[in-house]
Each structure stands twice: as structure tokens, then as C-alpha cells.
Amino acid sequence: MKKLIFLCLVLFSGMFFGQEIEEILEVPWPKEQKWKQLYDKKGLTSRLVAYLPDKESENDWTIKGRILYLYYAAENDVADVIDTYKDTFENNAPNAKMKVLEISKNRKTAIFKIENIRAEKLPHKVESELYYVFMGYDTVCIVFVSVKEKKLSTAFVKKWSEIFKNSKYSYREIKEKTDE
């Protein structure tokens, strides 16, 4: 009987633990616009998924949503992620303004915005972005929306902050291969 139980444990553990899983964040994109997936680029240590409203295109958009997954992340505090973004934008878009809006008590989630982002190659084009950082078990999930505006309105920040906070964290089996 002990051998039978041991055999069952070995077989079932292979079924459950032999599968590769990934952490995901399911964002409830606003229903007033139908959203479509623009692309899903997956590498060995990251994944970037982009979304647009159904009637917009990659070259002609008013709002773009993206989810960046950083796998095997060593960070355990959202402040590390925020500092990385701050350093990046200070070096690459010095006129951009960053403001941290909220950090959870357990330091696993944060919301911040970066406004007046101008690319060096296209200084006449300006964007602003609102970010939501979620620290998973070993994945950092960063959701952000971009608009072609110099500043984000209070209503925009409030609406999207609520959307981000209503995202569902879960796991799923990895079925696709990476691009790398």
C-alpha cells in the first residue's frame, strides 16, 4: 500500500510540477472601447504585450496599453522598479516629469506617472504614461497606458488607477515558445 501511495504521489507531482507556468496580470480593459492585442513579444526573461482600441492602428493611435513582465526578477520592493524608471527617464528624456502617486503598505504595488516624454529623435512628439507595478512571486508585472498628451488629466489618472487596481493576478501554463 505504501508503494502504491508513493507511486501515485510521484505521478501526480510530475503532472503538476512538471508543467511550466507563468504569472500573469489580467487587466480589465475599458468596455467602452473594444481592445485588441497588437503584439505579444516574448523573450527568455521578459514579455511585452501591447493593446490598442479596436479602431486604432500601431501608427495611428490615441491610447496604447502595454503589459511588461520581467521574469525571475530579484526586486522585492516596488521602489526598486520606480528607481529604475526614474534613472532611465532622467538619462533619456530629461524634460519628463515623474511623480509617484501611490505605494501599497506591503510595497508590492505602486502607481506612478511620467509626463512630457519627448524622444530625442522626435522632439515634436510628446507622450505621457501612467504605470502600475505589481510584484508577483518571481515576476514583476508593469502595466502602463500611453497617450499623446503633455500631461495626464486627473480624471484619466483616477479612471486608469482603478482599472489597474482591479487587475487579477493569476498563473497559467506556458504553451508558447519564446522569440529568443
Predicted regions: what they are:
Residues 3-13, 18:
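Sec-dependent N-terminal signal peptides
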Residues 19-25:
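Cleaved targeting-peptide boundary
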Residues 31, 78-81, 85, 156, ...:
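Stable alpha-helical elements in mature extracytoplasmic
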Residues 34-73:
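Secretory pathway targeting signatures of secreted, lumenal, and periplasmic proteins
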Residues 55-56, 70-74, 117-118, 134-138, ...:
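Short, flexible beta-strand-to-coil junctions
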Residues 63-104:
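Mid-chain, structured segments of secreted extracytoplasmic proteins
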Residues 90-132:
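Signature of long, low-cysteine stretches enriched in small and polar/charged residues
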Residues 138-180:
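Surface-exposed amphipathic alpha-helical segments
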